[in-house]
């Protein structure tokens, strides 16, 4: 009986020693495999071969599921998937990365902007709030949250975030534009015009600023000035079909139906469906 016990003990010890000796080797092989797939993934990214890069990063994660490197790998995987237009897959990858590193600011921002690209502002808002709870001066998070607040018509909250953003970065162009558009929404037309004029003067080749100011001028019924801005915007971006629609709408306000129809025809030629402009065409008759 004693001999049997000793034999069983020795056999168990051999197994333990075998596992103890083999485990580092297994981990080493897994790490080497992960490193191989990671290097390939980065190489494919540099070549802009995104499908191959995605597959390599997946293989890298699978090679060592418990590796600390998986935070970085899953984040890169999400970025590649996003660039491929696979937003749901990207969000899933970012979420898995957050399981390894909860409340990582960079990953939360990546997931928030992916949510916004999908139109899921509510989930983006949660991520942005988590970012700002951890890093109160995060400019990008302040901008995107202000944008969401504006869409919700929570104008006071939006203004507070824009003010915080501009206190941090007074020349933040998107922040300045966002605040001007917010003033426009709230009917502060002269203030909005002044802010947009400052942006136009600083960036005279930016068609977006010209169109935004034109919209304010139209609301103030300063049609001739608005027309100058739209003409300037079209000169900068002559293939933007929506600018021609905007000018056509202005021409209709000015009772210039022939000019309006010509701009609508131009928008159709640039790719807009004629049926989507049917109401405006009727006004040209």
Where are these predicted regions, by residue range?
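TPR alpha-solenoid repeat register
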Residues: 36, 70-73, 107, 141, ...
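Position-specific recognition of the canonical hydrophobic site in helix A of tetratricopeptide repeat
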Residues: 38, 45, 75, 79-82, ...
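Canonical tetratricopeptide repeat
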Residues: 39, 72-76, 110, 144, ...
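Short coil turns that delineate tetratricopeptide repeat
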Residues: 65-68, 102, 136, 170, ...
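Terminal, low-structured helical/coil segments at or just beyond the last alpha-helical repeat
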Residues: 249, 253-285
């Amino acid at each position: 009986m004693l001999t049997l016990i000793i034999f069983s003990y020795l056999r168990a010890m051999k197994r333990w020693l075998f596992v103890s000796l083999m485990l580092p080797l297994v981990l080493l092989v897994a790490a080497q495999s992960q490193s191989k797939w990671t290097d390939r993934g980065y190489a494919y990214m540099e070549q802009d071969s995104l499908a191959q890069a995605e597959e390599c990063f997946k293989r890298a994660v699978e090679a060592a599921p418990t590796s600390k490197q998986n935070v970085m790998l899953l984040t890169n995987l999400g970025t590649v998937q996003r660039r491929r237009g696979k937003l749901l897959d990207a969000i899933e990858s970012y979420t898995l990365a957050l399981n390894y590193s909860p409340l990582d600011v960079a990953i939360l921002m990546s997931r928030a902007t992916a949510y916004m690209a999908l139109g899921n502002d509510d989930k983006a808002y949660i991520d942005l709030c988590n970012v700002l709870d951890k890093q109160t001066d995060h400019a990008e998070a302040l901008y995107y949250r202000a944008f969401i607040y504006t869409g919700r018509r929570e104008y006071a909250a939006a203004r507070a975030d824009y003010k915080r953003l501009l206190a941090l970065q007074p020349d933040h162009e998107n922040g300045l534009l966002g605040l001007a558009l917010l003033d426009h929404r709230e009917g502060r037309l002269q203030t909005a015009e002044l802010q947009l004029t400052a942006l136009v003067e600083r960036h005279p080749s930016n068609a977006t600023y010209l169109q935004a100011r034109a919209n304010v001028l139209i609301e103030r019924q300063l049609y001739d000035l608005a027309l100058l801005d739209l003409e300037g915007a079209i000169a900068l971006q002559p293939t933007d079909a929506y600018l021609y629609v905007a000018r056509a709408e202005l021409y209709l306000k000015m009772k210039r139906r022939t000019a309006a129809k010509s701009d609508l025809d131009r928008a159709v030629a640039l790719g807009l469906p004629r049926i989507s402009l049917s109401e405006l065409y009727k006004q040209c008759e």
